[in-house]
Amino acid sequence: MKQYTRRSALKLLGIGTVTIAGFGLAGCSGSGEGVKNASEPVPASQAFGQAGVWMVYDGDKQIGKDVAIEEVLFFDGNGNVASYQCESLTFGDLDGLSDDEIVELAKQQDEAAFNAAKQAALDATDEAIQAWQPCYDTLKAEADAGTYDSIGYYGDYGIENVPEEDRAQVVETYQTTLDNTQDALDAANKGQAFNKAAAYQEPEAKPYTLRLETDGSGNAAANESLVFQLAKFSFYQANINVDENDLTSDRTRFRILVDYGWDNNAEIPDSAFGSTKKSIELCSPTYSTTQTVYGTTFGGYSGLATVVNEGHAGFTWDTPDTEGIEVD
């Protein structure tokens, strides 16, 4: 997995020696400098209430240079958070980067994830259309010619092998299959047009919630979670949906006739950009969540970390009387 040094990361971002305006984290009153320098454990409401950048990773792992980052979260200091999907980012890649630079790198990762998901949907849908269109064309030609060659009757194919009294049913089956498959092809082509038109958009910052659970007494914290809307991409993706990808054989087309055509139940999303609720339990593992990677120190909760200064006191839960959080 490729690692980025500070110099190569800055070059990748096109920053060079120029200080970027970025997201306005540095020097503002709502910045996370107090969080980074804390001499006492920082409760969650303060940690996320200030503008800052946090990395989501596998909480069963200890932070290390090769540990993958799943998402980067940007808290705006006003109760909102934006989530960026990461394809190939590790803690080692963040060495020496500022919060602004991390978010810019995460944006590039998020756009790469969007492009990969879009291409996968385009490829799958195109494969399905390319498989089903010739199948439809063949069945339509057989119906137009009145031969119905794909119908099987005890191993023999063609309308002439079907008893006279059953032929009306064969014709009806053919027509139903053609109608269903044409509708499915029309939907697939519309879905493919949706995919092609989709263009990347940076995720929006949305409100997050801190939920605290109390112990049996109701007076002390027993657990706390960060709940937010995780951005996700939605594309139309059609699948061939038959046991064999070869739709050119009589036997396969006969099975299609029995199933009344292409059962394409894929739906066109309202938007390529959606979200799903995600909850991260702010728990501490048996090992320390403060870890130095190269020249950068990370601290936080299990599965959720931010850049801190060396000697940081760590992070903790809120108390039940903390304002602005949900309790039980």
Q: What are the residue ranges of the model-derived segments?
A:
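Sec-dependent signal peptide hydrophobic core
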Residues: 13-20
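Mature extracytoplasmic/lumenal regions of exported proteins
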Residues: 224-289, 293
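C-terminal motif of bacterial Sec signal peptides marking the signal peptidase cleavage site
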Residues: 24-27
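Bacterial lipoprotein signal-peptidase II cleavage site
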Residues: 29-36
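N-terminal export leaders
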Residues: 9-10
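Tryptophan-anchored aromatic micro-motifs
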Residues: 36-69
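Edge beta-strand at a domain terminus
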Residues: 38, 260, 269-328
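N-terminal glycine/threonine-rich, aromatic-flanked beta-hairpin/loop signature
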Residues: 52-53, 62-239
